[in-house]
Amino acid sequence: MKILMRADTHVSYSVPAEGPKANFTFSQVLAALSVSLCSLVVGFVSAYTSPALVSMTDRTITSFEVTKDAGSWVGGIMPLAALAGGITGGPLIEYLGRRTTILATAVPFIVSSLLIACAVNVIMILCGRFLTGFCVGIASLSLPVYLGETLQPEVRGTLGLLPTALGNIGILVCYVAGSFMNWSMLAFLGAALPVPFLILMIIIPETPRWFVNRGQEERARKALKWLRGKEADVEPELKDLMQSQAEADSQARRNTCLELFKRINLKPLSISLGLMFFQQFSGINAVIFYTVQIFKDAGSTIDSNLCTIIVGIVNFFATFMGILLIDRLGRKILLYISDIAMILTLSILGGFFYCKAHGPDVSHLGWLPLTCFVIYILGFSLGFGPIPWLMMGEILPAKIRGPAASVVTAFNWFCTFVVTKTFQDLTVAMGAHGAFWLFGVVCIVGLFFVIICVPETRGKSLEEIERKMMGRVPISAVVNIKPFSFNM
């Protein structure tokens, strides 16, 4: 799944080398929780098709026909709409503000779910899914920008985990509820989830950086006071923000989107695009969107709805494992582990479905698909899930980070659409085994891409990474591992 955890797309940070240790102020926790509740909604709607399509295509439950082709569009139209939303979200967060843009998605999220819940034909469902996807695309840009501009660097890693965690909770909620709700009732639940997010977003302020960008120094000061605490001295931070904005304005006048295609910038852009390609063509969103259908086709001896719940739980806990390990093992080691796990499990899944279709009998191995799915999700969530987004924010040069990240984000959503829309067609043309083997071959190519092209960025500042990516100093492609500390 691509729950939509996007890196810092339209903003670059100026972080002092030294500074006071940040505290987990209640206001910062509240701000992070408020926007992360939007991520919970995103997780829920992204996973919706997995449990919903089974009852949606059942004529004893649904009063109108949903063909297999229409079902593929129910899954595929959301990422296509998210691509459009992602492109639209960039200008919106600049002109309306980060908070206002996020807040503006709440009501459409509710309306889109109600449109699906009350649908009397496939067109209404598709319209609801398109509106849902459009909001998801906007959220995918605006959530990380808001958090990046409001949280202090010392707590950004911990509180920045909340969107990923709540997004995975949203997936799990959808799987659990989908085990006993039909598609219509599940959509009604989806309409209720944005309400807490809507209420909390009204309470929190706009980001100080956006106020500074608009020349509203006093409002920026008030927002910083709210976020840092009334007793905090916010003047040094405000001064840094104003200086950073002045430098960004100066660069914006000198550089255009044509900078993206200069040879010196193509290397980091190509690496980021490559990581996004291999992330999506590992087949993750096909797995998330069609989990129930896959287990049903596999003839697993374990209830398909229970299988999806187990997959959701694994996805949730694997996220925390990745966070704990990424600054210990480094990016490349986790990408290696991730790729190898996906290659092995996709190969075995392909073999299982081949034997199921052509023999020998594998009915006694009904537990095998679930085992492979668990390891596959675990591997993806450790590496190729979060790291492409993290590295997008690390390796793209500051002066092109905004437009470059928009290109990378749009490309990711395009790949998501292609995978989710064509998965069922692939299973018809090649068989389920052929589809899984194809994803496995892509993962093998992705492994070589990581070995040869992807730099190790652990422990390096953004400035150091940029100097190396620009070729001013050589960059190492060799992994480096930080020893574990057992101090409590």
Swiss-Prot record:
It comes from the Eukaryota. Disulfide bonds: none annotated. Glycans are attached at residue 182. GO terms for cellular component: plasma membrane. Keywords: Cell membrane, Glycoprotein, Membrane, Transmembrane, Transmembrane helix. The chain crosses the membrane at residues 29-49, 73-93, 106-126, 130-150, 161-181, 185-205, 269-289, 306-326, 333-353, 373-393, 403-423, 434-454. Residues 50-72, 127-129, 182-184, 290-305, 354-372, 424-433 are extracellular. Residues 1-28, 94-105, 151-160, 206-268, 327-332, 394-402, 455-488 are cytoplasmic. Pfam families: Sugar_tr. It is found in: Cell membrane. It is a multi-pass membrane protein. One of its GO terms (molecular function) is sugar transmembrane transporter activity. Signal peptide: none annotated. Fails to transport trehalose. PANTHER family: FACILITATED TREHALOSE TRANSPORTER TRET1-1-RELATED, PTHR48021. Belongs to the major facilitator superfamily. Sugar transporter (TC 2.A.1.1) family. Trehalose transporter subfamily. This is Facilitated trehalose transporter Tret1-2 homolog. It comes from Drosophila simulans. The gene is Tret1-2.
